[in-house]
């Protein structure tokens, strides 16, 4: 869970076995193959939100309020479903499993069981690695 880390301090998040998420570049990239997927701003914010909550379930209403409305996007179930699908396709296009994002029926979504490593950029000079299991 990364909720205590300011988003503007996150350089990269390594999800699972080498999927690199760079929020400021709106990209997902596989470390081994170099396969890259570009995300739109709402998808980037959605993935950040899910990462912030880790394995805790994020309800649809929470996501619609904190991601979609907060970013001026249409806050509808259909739009949320489209963005979850878009994220899963982006993840699989880099060779990683779509199950990195888990649907909890009638409840919401959460991150899967993958390890999450966060690389922080402090003052543009030094990098820190924090590992969450």
What are these regions (language model features)?
Residues 1, 125-133:
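N-terminal/domain-start alpha-helical segments
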Residues 36-67, 87:
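Short amphipathic alpha-helical recognition elements used for nucleic-acid or partner binding
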Residues 4-12, 97-125:
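A short linear beta-strand->loop->alpha-helix hinge motif most characteristic
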Residues 66-74:
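Short helix-coil junctions and helix-kink-helix linkers
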Residues 1-40:
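Short boundary/linker motifs that mark transitions into or out of structured domains
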Residues 39-47, 73-92, 107:
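DNA-recognition element of transcription regulators
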């Amino acid at each position: 869970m990364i909720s205590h880390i300011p988003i503007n301090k996150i350089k990269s998040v390594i999800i699972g076995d080498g999927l690199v998420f760079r929020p400021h570049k709106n990209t997902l990239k596989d470390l081994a193959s170099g396969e890259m997927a570009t995300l739109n701003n709402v998808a980037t914010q959605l993935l950040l939100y899910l990462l912030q909550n880790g394995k805790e379930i994020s309800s649809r209403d929470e996501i619609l309020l904190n991601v979609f409305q907060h970013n001026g996007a249409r806050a509808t179930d259909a739009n949320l479903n489209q963005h979850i699908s878009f994220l899963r396709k982006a993840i699989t296009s880099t060779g990683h499993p779509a199950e990195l994002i888990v649907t909890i029926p009638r409840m919401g979504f959460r991150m899967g069981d993958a390890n999450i490593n966060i690389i922080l950029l402090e003052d543009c000079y030094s990098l820190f690695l924090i590992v969450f299991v």
